[in-house]
Amino acid sequence: VGEVHFAPGTVARVRTIDYFDGSGNLTLREQYDIRGFKTADEFFGQDGQMHYQALYRPDQTKYMERYYVKSTENTPINSLNRLINYQGHDYYFDTIDDLFTFFLDQLNNSTAEDNTFIADRPAMANNPVMDMMTPAKKLLWLPINHVAEGNDPVAGVLSGVYQQALNRDNIGRLDGLIVMTAQQKADLKKRFKRQIKIYQVSGGIAATGEPVPMAQRQSNRIIHVGRLGFDKQIDQVIQVFQGIHDQIPTATLTLYGYGEGADVAKFEEQVKNAGLEGLVTFAGYLPDTSSVYENAQLYLDCARIDGQPLSLVEALGHGVPALAYDYPYGPSDLITNGKNGYLIAPNTPTKMIQTAVKLLKNPARLQKMSAQAYELSRAVDAQHVWKQWQTIIKG
């Protein structure tokens, strides 16, 4: 028996085909690329867990085999990876990190240039980049806070994903760290002193389109863009909007982005209990949000912690004044208080409500802040961000 699953958002394009034995147990899953060719065979045991995987090229030649053993929790653990007939030889790797490092070294050797490798996914890329055997410039990009929430950024315990990479024995294997904000750069320089170079490069690039006047936007339209989770304190965004709506009945809130189903359900229940149905919209994920920003008059950010919120860069770049809690890291680098938005003390929704109402009731002030949002965003436009990268590439 075979069960065909189609790729979301397509018409009859196969994503997977599952095969079952006579007892209804999954035995084989074929994975397909959206372009129409098979990419993998995955074989399952009687316990329902994968034990072997074969990977294929577009011409259907097999290039890799991956083997799995059972953990104490009865989940599959990758125990061996076989790279088949690479330059006439088979190679065996105990872990995917070892395979990743091998790939990076092969890539590095494929050119005669002085190459730079940047690990930008801490859990996946830090160790493979640091373990490279061939000479190259190696840097880590820190997309999140380097310490756990609530810890001192200079002396506190490092976040788990950085404890190995940034310990005393390993940090000397790196040529630098890249962060997105001046505040985090300053904290890391205090922490590591002269042990390693710290670079700052904006993670977001502001748009450079024609300004859209506030009068052409939907009146009192408030937005938030990003992952919908309790760490982002979407519950407080809704709470703040409720306070705004009590004083400005025409105000609306639209939330763009995805989240865990259970979390989103709780936010929807909060909206229902507050009597805000029809005023708060969960719009889901959009690949292009330019029109969203250009029709909004105010952006709210009630998060506890972040690296540099991309949506805040985008909102300001589209002339949307922003109110954000002054958390580490991001808002204080992007918002000049009273110019393009306001920094609000964390977890003070009443203060954010008061600030938002005062601003929305003053169209002239709102328009001035929008113009300043466009102007100040030039500091993170494509030209300026490219100059930041040049200090790393040429340094």
Walk through the language-model features, giving the residues of each.
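A short, active-site helix/loop in glycosyltransferases that binds the activated sugar's phosphate group
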Residues: 160-196
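A conserved mid-protein helix/loop that constitutes part of the nucleotide-sugar donor-binding site
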Residues: 220, 224-243
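Glycosyltransferase donor-sugar binding loop
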Residues: 225, 253-265
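A short, well-ordered alpha-helix in the C-terminal region of glycosyltransferases
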Residues: 250, 292, 351, 358, ...
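Nucleotide-activated donor-binding/catalytic signature segment of Leloir-type glycosyltransferases, i.e.
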Residues: 264-284
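Aromatic "clamp/platform" in nucleotide-sugar-dependent glycosyltransferases that forms part
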Residues: 285, 304
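Short hydrophobic beta-strand element within catalytic cores of glycosyltransferases
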Residues: 321-325
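Conserved acidic donor-binding segment of nucleotide-sugar-dependent glycosyltransferases
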Residues: 336-338, 342-349, 357-364
